[in-house]
Every structure is written in structure tokens, then in C-alpha cells.
């Protein structure tokens, strides 16, 4: 199996993560994995996001299966960019896959995140912004594995 170098970028919504992902995607040596835990999150929470049915049908909704794919899934190119939304991780049960990846935390000024999020979502909960989950995932990787992710 090809030795693929994998980058996991952990973000919350409205952090310009899609723009960064597209930038990496424009390179000819990168494959992209966009929000692989989205279906798992939707199925576990029952939240009716736009295109709920299509997402559930197009992705695995099993956290264990998705984490294994993030760690060992085959891709054609030498590098893989994984865009992860921190609020899609319900708990830290399936984060061990991140040990084998280079982890990066994308953080944007919270006031700008909130301002941008409020424009698109009138009803929201603080948990929807992913700040707490991002901190928890960072701390988990640091405390459990001794990793010092890039911020």
C-alpha cells in the first residue's frame, strides 16, 4: 500500500476551512476528504441539516468505520487533506486514528466566526460553533498521545 501522508485539519464552522481545503485541493499531489464524520454526526444526533438524506446515503455513518478509513483508506495521491468539523465528533471514542496523522487546528477570531454564523443561522447553540469541541480534541490529543498539534 502506498505511504500516504495525511493531514487532519480540525475546524469549526465559518473558520474559512472550505477555502483552505480548496487551496490544497488545487494541488495535483493532494486528495481531499471533506467532513468524513458528517453522516455519523447527523445520524447520531438526528439533526435535520440540509441534504440530510443524501448525506446519510453517500457516507458511512459508523464512527469506527469512518475513523479507520481516515487512518488507512486508500487514495491515489501522495498526500491527503482531511477537513474535520470538531462538532461532528460527539465524543473522543474514535479519535485514536488521529495519532497517525499530522493534526492542525484552524482557529479564526471568535467574534468573526459568530458574526458570520449568525448571518446564516438565526437559531443556534454555542455548541454549534465547535469551540469547546476543538479545545477538547486538542487537549485529548495532547494529553493522551503527547501530540502538540499545529494551531
Where on the chain are the PLM-derived regions?
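A generic structural signal for alpha->beta connector loops
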Residues: 27-30, 78, 100, 146-148
Amino acid at each position: 500500500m502506498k505511504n500516504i501522508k495525511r493531514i487532519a485539519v480540525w475546524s469549526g464552522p465559518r473558520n474559512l476551512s472550505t477555502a483552505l481545503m480548496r487551496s490544497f485541493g488545487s494541488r495535483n499531489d493532494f486528495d481531499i476528504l471533506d467532513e468524513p464524520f458528517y453522516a455519523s454526526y447527523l445520524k447520531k444526533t438526528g439533526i435535520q441539516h440540509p441534504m440530510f438524506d443524501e448525506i446519510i446515503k453517500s457516507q458511512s455513518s459508523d464512527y469506527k468505520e469512518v475513523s479507520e478509513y481516515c487512518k488507512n483508506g486508500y487514495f491515489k495521491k501522495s498526500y491527503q487533506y482531511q477537513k474535520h468539523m470538531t462538532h461532528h465528533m460527539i465524543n473522543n471514542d474514535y479519535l485514536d486514528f488521529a495519532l497517525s496523522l499530522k493534526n492542525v487546528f484552524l482557529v479564526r477570531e471568535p467574534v468573526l466566526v459568530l458574526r458570520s454564523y449568525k448571518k446564516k443561522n438565526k437559531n443556534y447553540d454555542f455548541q454549534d460553533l465547535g469551540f469547546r469541541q476543538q479545545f477538547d480534541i486538542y487537549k485529548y490529543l495532547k494529553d493522551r498521545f503527547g501530540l502538540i498539534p499545529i494551531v
